[in-house]
């Protein structure tokens, strides 16, 4: 019997449905993982070292390819839209961002310079990067231009 992916429940921001992750086309590291993040909700992934917490988050933000990993089954939706086939920068553009453990900024740079380091490998033109930077300031007005 064929299994179909469940539809995003009303009010869910993220729906992960029965995903499978494989590294190097051989090593199965996740199988049958599902979770829902309701709008306004908080969800915690708990487990021992090596249980797949970070891999699940990397699957959601589509950062697995950098480590030769891929989602081979299931689906990942953000606001009822499939995002598992999008590039990482498109996932970010839609509002899903993974913040890694620890501090990943350069202390000698300003906030704006740190933000611009993330644009270093983008193929976008300066105007698009400037628009994205303005959007960040709109999301986080407490940063303000005084701190740049």
Indicate where each model-derived feature is located.
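The feature captures the beta-strand-to-loop junction immediately N-terminal to the Walker
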Residues: 46-48
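Conserved ABC ATPase "signature" region
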Residues: 75, 80-81, 127-145
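Short, conserved post-Walker A segment of ABC-type ATPase nucleotide-binding domains
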Residues: 43, 54-67
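Short beta-strand immediately N-terminal to the Walker A/P-loop
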Residues: 43-44, 98
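ABC ATPase NBD Q-loop/coupling interface
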Residues: 63-64, 75-93, 121-125
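Short coil-to-helix segment of the ABC ATPase nucleotide-binding domain corresponding to the Q-loop/switch region
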Residues: 57, 108-117
């Amino acid at each position: 019997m064929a299994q179909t992916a469940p539809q995003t429940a009303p009010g869910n921001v993220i729906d992960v449905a029965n995903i499978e992750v494989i590294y190097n086309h051989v090593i199965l590291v996740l199988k049958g993982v599902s979770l829902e993040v309701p709008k306004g909700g908080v969800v915690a992934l708990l487990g021992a070292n090596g249980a797949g917490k970070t891999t699940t988050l990397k699957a959601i933000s589509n950062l697995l390819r950098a480590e030769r990993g891929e989602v081979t089954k299931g689906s990942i939706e953000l606001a009822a839209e499939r995002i598992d086939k999008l590039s990482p920068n498109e996932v970010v553009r839609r509002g899903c961002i993974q913040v890694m453990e620890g501090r990943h900024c350069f202390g000698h740079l300003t906030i704006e310079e740190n933000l611009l380091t993330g644009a270093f490998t983008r193929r976008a033109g300066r105007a698009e990067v400037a628009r994205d930077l303005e959007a960040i300031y709109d999301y986080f007005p407490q940063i303000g231009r005084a701190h740049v």
